[in-house]
A protein has these predicted regions:
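Non-catalytic carbohydrate-binding regions of carbohydrate-active enzymes
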Residues: 257-355, 381-397
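Long, charge-dense tracts
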Residues: 97-98
Length: 406
């Protein structure tokens, strides 16, 4: 203990990052997972509990720089929340406290989805009006693909039929020539998975654009023809493109062989995201939609969930780095209102950091940063000893593998 205290004092006097190093070495995977689950539930509960109780529209606040998007904000919150929490729910219930918590939220989510697609429910959501509903029908579809047993499998036949009807309503919306093309693709992928048929034109168009025209190199896609330095490769492009191709390959659809290339690109992009995490557990505040908070790490979490991290990245270092980010991002009570709803911001209540298309519902994309909770507690991601992430090692004077482009 004396040596630890002396190390901390020496670090404070010299500026050396002793405290972050000690943090990385002292935290167990079990403790990290508890932090993730606690934060996940805190974020998701207001959305899922109110939707299950048919009080979402009544209770969910509306905050935005634009006054005219409230009617779409509910599906935004629902689709994004389910997209992020689905892998964790897919583990199913068990006798552990966490397993019982999953049971609770599986039941709430299944009931909530049934309400969201029921025209007689006060929480019936809009899927077929241009243009925003396409985005969040897509996130809902991706969530269903991520939990086929616990969510889709537990819906009643009538609710499944109505989900299909509502997803098909989004076909009237023409996507922009940007990441939006993948929203149409993922909706069709879900329809293919759950009904055995889809609109192959809408399915394939986005895949071909990103594969043939919009790849810029070293795992970076343009958001359309142009490249933008933001996190949309993580918010949308890599995760949705990968999930679409997984469905295409499963159903032996033409052009699904691109999945092998895409998985390598996802792994490389995940490696880049891991290197964005500073020794202190922060990351660059750059690009639009930065108020999606931990949604920045959607692609990194997906690569971990699918065991697609590059060989030189130890899963535990991703766990430790992301845990520190989660703690930093949600430490301030200013992230939430008095009823637990997310406020627009980055690490607090900071609405001026947002764009006009952002509203309360939009911010729940942060939950896509929690995908590794879909790995069981005995997976090496959670069970391995703590490991320092790249920047923590590099700034502590330790050896780090050279970084190579794809």
């Amino acid at each position: 203990m004396k040596r630890i205290i002396l190390s901390i004092v020496w670090g404070l006097l010299t500026g050396w990052a002793a405290v972050p190093c000690l943090w990385a070495q002292s935290r167990t995977g079990t403790a990290d997972r508890e932090i993730w689950v606690k934060t996940l539930v805190r974020l998701a509960d207001p959305v899922l509990s109110n939707l299950a109780n048919e009080t979402l529209k009544k209770e969910m606040p509306y905050e935005s720089l634009a006054p005219n998007r409230q009617r779409f904000s509910y599906l935004e919150a629902v689709g994004r929340t389910i997209c992020g929490i689905a892998p964790w729910l897919e583990l199913g219930e068990d006798d552990t406290p966490e397993g019982q918590l999953r049971k609770k939220y599986i039941e709430l989510t299944v009931k909530g989805i049934s309400n969201a697609v029921n025209p007689s429910s006060p929480d019936y959501l809009i899927f077929g009006e241009p243009s925003q509903p396409l985005v969040d029908a897509a996130f809902l579809a991706e969530g269903l693909l991520r939990a086929p047993k616990q969510l889709w499998g537990n819906l009643s036949p009538a609710a499944r039929k109505q989900v299909v009807t509502e997803l098909k309503r989004s076909r009237v919306i023409k996507p922009n020539e940007s990441n939006w093309l993948l929203f149409a693709s993922i909706v069709e992928a879900a329809l293919q998975e759950f009904t055995g048929e889809c609109d192959t034109t809408r399915l394939n168009y986005g895949v071909r654009k990103f594969r043939d025209l919009w790849y810029k190199g070293d795992a970076q896609y343009g958001d359309g023809a142009e490249f933008h330095l933001d996190y949309y490769n993580s918010f949308v492009i890599h995760p949705m493109l990968t999930d679409v191709l997984v469905v295409m390959q499963k159903h032996r659809m033409p052009e699904s062989e691109f999945l092998n290339v895409q998985q390598k690109r996802l792994g490389r992009y995940a490696e880049q995201l891991e290197r964005f995490i500073s020794p202190e557990g922060t990351y660059p505040v750059i690009g639009r939609s930065i108020v999606y908070r931990t949604g920045v790490f959607h692609a990194l979490g997906q690569a971990a969930l699918l065991h697609l991290l590059p060989q030189q990245i130890v899963p535990a270092q991703v766990r430790c780095g992301m845990t520190k980010v989660i703690e930093n991002q949600f430490r301030s009570a200013a992230n939430f209102d008095t009823k637990g709803w997310l406020k627009i911001g980055f690490s607090g209540n900071q609405i001026q950091m947002s764009e006009s298309y952002i509203n309360t519902g939009s911010t729940y994309l942060c939950l896509t940063g929690f995908l590794p909770l879909g790995l069981p507690a005995d997976d090496p991601f959670w069970s391995a000893p703590p490991a320092e992430w790249t920047n923590l090692k590099a700034w502590s004077g330790k050896e780090v593998p050279a970084d190579h482009s794809l």
